[in-house]
Amino acid sequence: LIGHLDTVFPENSPFQKMERLPDSTVKGPGTNDMKGGNVILLFALKALHEAGELTDAQIIVALTGDEELTGKPISLSRKDLIEAGQRSDIALGFENSTGFNNVTLARRGSSGWKVEIKGKRRHSAGIFLTGVGAGAVFESGRILNDFYETLKGETYLTFNPGIILGGTEISYHEPSNTGNAFGKTNVVAQSVIIDGDLRFISEEQKEITRAKMRAIVANNLPETSAKITFFDSYPAMPPTQENKDLLKKFSKVSIDMGHGPVEAWDPSKRGAADVSFVA
C-alpha cells in the first residue's frame, strides 16, 4: 500500500497551512495530493483489523517523503520500495483518483532532457555567411520545431520544453529552474540551453523517442553544434492483463455495494507516481 507525505508546494509558497472549513472538509497543501489518500489507506487497515482480516496477512505500507521530486540516485531512493513490491502479490497506490468510479491501471513514465547548443559569436551583419553560420538561437528553433513536427501525435507521448535561455552568455541553475541570459541584437547568439520533460507509456516508447530526438539534435545548422542529455525519473506503468483482472474485482465490489461499475482512467490524464517503480 503506497502513499507519500510530501507536496509540490515549495517553502516560499504562501500556501502552507491547513484550514478546517465549515462543511467538515479541510484545505491546505497536499490535502488532495495526497493526505486524503493516506487517510483512506489508514482507515482501510483499521477496517480490516476490526474484521479480523489481518491475521496471517503480509501488508507493507510504504509512505515516501520524496515522491514529488525523487531522490537521486533512484537505485537507492527506491530500493526498499522495489524490494517490497517483489515480496507482494498486489500493489495499490492511494494517490488521489478522479472519482469513485475510476481507477488508474496505467501511468506514463517521466524523463528529463536538456539540449545545449553552441554557435559562433560574430557581428550580426555576417549571419548566415560562411564562417559565421546560423547562431545558437536559430539552431534551437530548428531543433524544437523538428521535435514538434516529428514527435507530436503519438498516443500517450508528450514532450515539453519548459525553459529556454539564449544569447551571448547564459547561466542556468537547474535545482531552481532559474537562470540569466545576456545578449545584444547585433551579435549572433553563442549559447542556448533548453530544459524539458518527456512522458511515455512504455520503456520501448521512451527509447524510440530518445533515438529520434538524438538524430534531430545531431542535424545541425551551419557553424552550430548541439548535444542532448536525458535524465531518468519515473518508469512507465503500462496497462497489463493482471491490472485489468484486478479492476474486475474492484468493479464487482463496487457494484455489490451499490456504487456502480469502476472503469479505467485515461493514462494520458495522470502523472507519474511511486507505484510505477513496483509495477
Which sequence ranges carry the predicted segments?
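Short, small-residue-enriched loops and turns at beta-alpha junctions
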Residues: 8-9, 68-70, 100, 234-239
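Short pre-catalytic strand/loop immediately N-terminal to key active-site residues, enriched for Gly-Thr
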Residues: 23-33, 261-265
